[in-house]
Amino acid sequence: MTLKIGTRGSKLATTQAGTIRDQLKHYGRDAELHIVTTPGDVNMSPVERIGVGVFTQALRDVLHSGECDVAVHSMKDLPTATDPRFHLVVPTRADSREALIARDGLTLAELPEGAKVGTSAPRRISQLKAIRPDLEILPLRGNIDTRMGKVTSGELDAVMLAYAGLTRVGMQDRATEVFDADIIMPAPAQGALAIECRADDTETVRALNMLMHADTFVSAVAERTVLNRLEAGCTAPVAAHATLDGYSGDTMTLTAGVYALDGSDQLVFSAEGDGARPEELGELVAQQLIDAGAANLLGDRS
């Protein structure tokens, strides 16, 4: 049986799903892409206005109905609450860092005063304003080509994108600066894909399990636990970044931050813990943020 892989129709989404198709074929399972249009592809309003799950719910609906056998999501878009209808597999993560694409090869520090920078992500807006309060931050939606085209046309001086997206479509050389997590922290699970199938489809569960990458899975779980504990959606100004000890992988370091949208304040905490118990570490760091007053920064966004 040929597996139908549900995916959004953008270049990035089909490229991501195509890598999963190719990996499944490598393991002897035929697969093909099944394009699904989501509300987030049609409505260009800021994501926080449309609602959590705007990119993922339509894919889950066709998966649950049996119209497709597998759904591929960007994991950072997936609601943090576990859905028992589905089995989740997380393959190897791409580079989780944030990237700037600016005119004339400029870095963030080199952008002129009052430069126009495009992004709609509150997490990016708040961190950019903390570093460069003079910048004019403008809303930005659309696919990668559309976003970068606003720089090429001169409408914007720069845009902020996930570096993983650029690398997946072969445009990593367009980045004029890539930020380490201690400069601009990425979204929880940024760079990771979430592959779902129906939990009772045992044959497909077995096939997808061959793609599981344990280190990526536990890192993403730790980061997303922070988001879940804060009761914040994927559009909240919350960032998180987990790393595993390079030698044994037994020790995980998790850093997470909550930011004021105007860049005037931030809370950032880190902790180390057992890499095999990512939820506990996520809960610990989230509690540190809560105790320090995270709710005051999240406001009615949580």
Curated annotation (Swiss-Prot):
Origin: domain of life: Bacteria
UniProt keyword list: Porphyrin biosynthesis, Transferase
GO biological process, one term: protoporphyrinogen IX biosynthetic process
GO-annotated cellular components: cytoplasm
Gene3D superfamilies reported for this sequence: Periplasmic binding protein-like II, Porphobilinogen deaminase, C-terminal domain
Residue numbers of S-(dipyrrolylmethanemethyl)cysteine PTMs: 234
One Pfam family linked to the record: Porphobil_deamC
Cofactor annotation comment: Binds 1 dipyrromethane group covalently.
SUPFAM superfamilies: Periplasmic binding protein-like II, Porphobilinogen deaminase (hydroxymethylbilane synthase), C-terminal domain
Cofactor(s) needed: dipyrromethane
Sample GO molecular function, one term: hydroxymethylbilane synthase activity
UniProt catalytic activity: 4 porphobilinogen + H2O = hydroxymethylbilane + 4 NH4(+)
Pathway(s) the chain acts in: Porphyrin-containing compound metabolism; protoporphyrin-IX biosynthesis; coproporphyrinogen-III from 5-aminolevulinate: step 2/4
InterPro entries: HemC (IPR000860), Porphobilin_deaminase_cofac_BS (IPR022419), Porphobilin_deaminase_N (IPR022417), Porphobilinogen_deaminase_C (IPR022418), Porphobilinogen_deaminase_C_sf (IPR036803)
EC number: 2.5.1.61
Subunit structure, interactors included: Monomer.
Family affiliation: Belongs to the HMBS family.
Other observations noted: The porphobilinogen subunits are added to the dipyrromethane group.
Purpose: Tetrapolymerization of the monopyrrole PBG into the hydroxymethylbilane pre-uroporphyrinogen in several discrete steps.
Name under which the protein is recorded: Porphobilinogen deaminase
Native organism: Corynebacterium glutamicum (strain ATCC 13032 / DSM 20300 / JCM 1318 / BCRC 11384 / CCUG 27702 / LMG 3730 / NBRC 12168 / NCIMB 10025 / NRRL B-2784 / 534)
Classification of source organism: Bacteria, Bacillati, Actinomycetota, Actinomycetes, Mycobacteriales
